[in-house]
Amino acid sequence: MGTPCHYALFDLQPAFRLDLDKLAVRYRELAREVHPDRFADASEREQRVALEKSAALNDAYQTLRSAPRRARYLLAIGGHEVPQEVTVHDPDFLLQQMQWREELEELQDEADLDGVGVFKKRLKVAQDTLNDDFADCWDDAAQRDKAERLMRRMQFLDKLAQEVRQLEERLDD
């Protein structure tokens, strides 16, 4: 049994831009259908299949709801498997990363919750810009390198956004 395309599980065509609210509604509908508890009285084989379907659905949903994971997945199904770990040759973005990290460290040292809020808004704008840029080029074979570079930038910003949320929680306590 092969793993079905994440998009096919949700009756979607591969695309970067998705309505995440509709995706969540469809996920809940499908999750109810394949939930292992519904198969408690079924045969062992049917229970195993239900568990596998539930796990595949959860993985597909987690992938599609995350912009960086969705970008990586789109590149992979397009035949451009992206290695997890590579040396990034993007000096401008590396410099930007260092500046963001320094700024976040200063906000933490100063316990500046308002400043963190402003930083978070700027980060969201940067993420939205990357998402738009990726959406415009991911399915163009001539722009695969650009799409991969944008996907890696998305991954960094996603990780930075998680760190910002954690800092917000610490400062808010």
Curated annotation (Swiss-Prot):
Organism annotation: Pseudomonas entomophila (strain L48)
Family: Belongs to the HscB family.
Protein name: Co-chaperone protein HscB homolog
Gene Ontology terms: cellular component: iron-sulfur cluster transfer complex
SUPFAM superfamilies (UniProt xref): Chaperone J-domain, HSC20 (HSCB), C-terminal oligomerisation domain
Its job: Co-chaperone involved in the maturation of iron-sulfur cluster-containing proteins. Seems to help targeting proteins to be folded toward HscA.
NCBIfam families documented for this protein: hscB, PRK00294.1
InterPro entries, alphabetized: DnaJ_domain (IPR001623), HscB (IPR004640), HscB_C_sf (IPR036386), HscB_oligo_C (IPR009073), J_dom_sf (IPR036869)
UniProt domain J: residue ranges: 5-77
